[in-house]
Amino acid sequence: MYRGFIHSRFRPSMLGTAVLLASVHAQGDNAGAPAAAVILEQTTISATRGEQPLDTVPSTVSVVDRERLDRDNVNDIQDLLRHEPGISAGGTGQRSGINGYNIRGIDGNRILTQVDGVEIPDSFFGGPYAQSQRNYVDPEIIKRVELLRGPASSLYGSSAIGGVVSYYTLAPEDILMPGKDIGARLKSGYSSADEGWLTSATLAGRTGEFDTLLHLSQRNGHEKQSFGEHHGTGLARTAADPQDARTTNVLAKAGWHYTDDDHLGLTYERYRDNRDIDLKSAYGGPYGKGVGRRMYRSRAGNDTVSRERQGIAHDFSLSSAVADHIKWSLNHQTAKTDQRTVEDYLPYNRHVLRVRNSHYQERQWVLDVQMDKAFQLADTEHLLTYGSQVRQQRVTGSRDGYGTCLRAFGKCRTAGADSRDDRLKKSSDFPDPTIDTYDLFVQDQIRWDHWTFTPSARYDYTRLTPHLTDAFTHTVNPGDKYPVADGTRTWHRLSPTFGVTYDFDGHYTAYGQYAEGFRTPSAKALYGQFENLAAGYTVQPNPDLEPEKSRSYETGLRGRFGGSSFDVALFYNQYRDFIDENAIRLGTVQNTFKSMNIRRATIKGIEFKGRLDLHTLGASEGFYTRGSVAYAHGRNEDTGQPLNSINPLKGVFGLGYERQRYGGALSWTLASPQNRVDSSAFKAPDGGGAFNTPGFGLLDLTGHYRVIEHVTLNAGIYNLANKKYWVWDDVRSYDGTGEAGAVAPANLDRLTAPGRNFAINLVWNI
């Protein structure tokens, strides 16, 4: 029966809680029976900024809950996306690690990634000694992840031009069992891919109107293995560079439920990842045309990535003409990347121990206010959602260094003396910006008969103020060749979206959506500059960059039949002034990196996923099959060349069996060769172009078993056939000989994904 907004509105989390209680009750009864062949209704929050059934939203959203995170042994972003075509994450073999999400060929800082509504920092690149990525979240604090494909600027602003990844952290009600006031969740796990151990504990309690939660977790591991087995040095090395890694995470919450519908909560979160890295692949460098100049006799690094957040949130109901429900939150977050590099450096005129330090920090305050009002107008039911967000970001960065003579040679008169040639005064590659953003948004979900119409719009005003710090003026004279253009830059934009869904008969739903998006240039792209003549490259600013703009069209059809389902989506995205932050101008002596606007670009594609209950075809109850396929095609309309951010065709197919107490699945991943590559920016020593990844097929076997009540064992064997393969996102900036400009050359075998590996975890809910 059709459910309207007024008579069946759920306050946030009630839908998810209902599903959870149903699941717990089912597990308690008939534990040995086959699992019911019914797909429980999933919900989404990110698609409309309010909890809605997934089938009612006019966009494509993947929802991964806590149970699936455990069953799939998700230890990082790449594990999360293992069986999710159309979304990927690269960074294998790189010092800075996983570099964030790629959704339908749009990646990097164009994907809004948020934790409880607070955006995590952008990535930053400033040469081999300064690289920050966007992996600031540990999966253990997450109760669900939502992956929203396509532009969402009308709800989330500039950062969401390519999609939204929303992490929602654990709350006390996720740990406490029905009828209990004290609960705990203990977990331990191991992954052979990086020889990593996990220890995690979450405690929750409730007394009267108050509840609390405390989570502590730690990971200890090493480098993620490649398929290569040569443990030498330099470009000949095919094994991963050695690492010792430790990640710790703390989450604390306290809440006051002063009525059934009103809640005031405090949150503290701290993430810290520390890695010691022996960069054996850099020994003998720098490299050019495959030949090392033998200046780096050794190179080691220590990288620390941290994020700390404090927040207060208030949800309350009221009966007024303005709103039925209001929620507001105020958060402060500080995120840092500190990198230290120590190298035995032997150029032609000295022998020194050289140290390089880099620091990147984003500090932000975010105030978010959202209201909703349900009302009826003639034959239509409305859910009006509107609000505002005010955000201030302060971005700082610096680098410094020194050198100590190791022996008397050339300019080094005595061992232990300071090397003036290697002294680097505190400098910065960009003028530290303050970014102030003011947003207003409104959305109306209108239900009429079987139709739901969802118009929405958001107005964004952004002001970027660069600051001429001493560190920046040490790098460049503001009155010289690359001035900081006219100080403050401002942008404003109205982003509309219109979506529609039609429910045919409770089984089929069709939808369509038109959305506009935009993204403002970063301070680094506008003003950032860096020069490394010895390595043969420079990074130049482009103060004339225009904001990116997009228009997106999507249509799809969904079907639900008990334990079977399917979803198909077609999309077509147009981009204007698309910013290529890795644009390269090739030179005879050195290469120049400079952000450039691509005037016109298009991305189009199709995605399909489905699940079939094989019991309907005569198989034993509990058997099912599933499959998903994603295809995208991107084109730079200015040059006619492909967009290198597009992943090749990929599909994941599986056969599974589920009972209440145990289950398992065999998954088959297929990826086609990457045949559409723009090689115009590559200058390979052998005259070739970019490295094109070959196709591959992988088998994964996973299973879970409830040992006793509330204790579950999850295990998986991945790349079962031990295949050698490359993921396109890991190698797309490399040419056929393994050189990436002059920044991070690598033997391509060192960038391969792990061979056969396994992961296991044990979860105990008390």
Please place each PLM-identified region on the residue numbering.
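Outer-membrane beta-barrel signature, preferentially recognizing the C-terminal barrel domain
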Residues: V291-S319, D429-I435, V484-S495, G499, ...
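Periplasmic-side early beta-strands and strand-to-turn transitions of outer-membrane beta-barrels
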Residues: E173, D181-R185, S191, L198, ...
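Short loop/turn motifs that connect adjacent beta-strands in outer-membrane beta-barrel proteins
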Residues: Y156, P172-I182, E209, D261, ...
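C-terminal beta-signal and adjacent terminal beta-strands/loops
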Residues: S123, F518, F571-R576, S672-D678, ...
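Signature of Gram-negative outer-membrane beta-barrel scaffolds
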Residues: E381-D505, E531
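Gram-negative outer-membrane beta-barrel transporters
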Residues: N30-A31, D379, T385, R447-F453, ...
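Outer-membrane beta-barrel domain signature, strongest for Gram-negative TonB-dependent receptors
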Residues: A239, A245-V395, S565-D567
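Acidic, small-polar-rich N-terminal luminal/periplasmic segments of exported/outer-membrane proteins
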Residues: G32-G179, S281, T555, K724
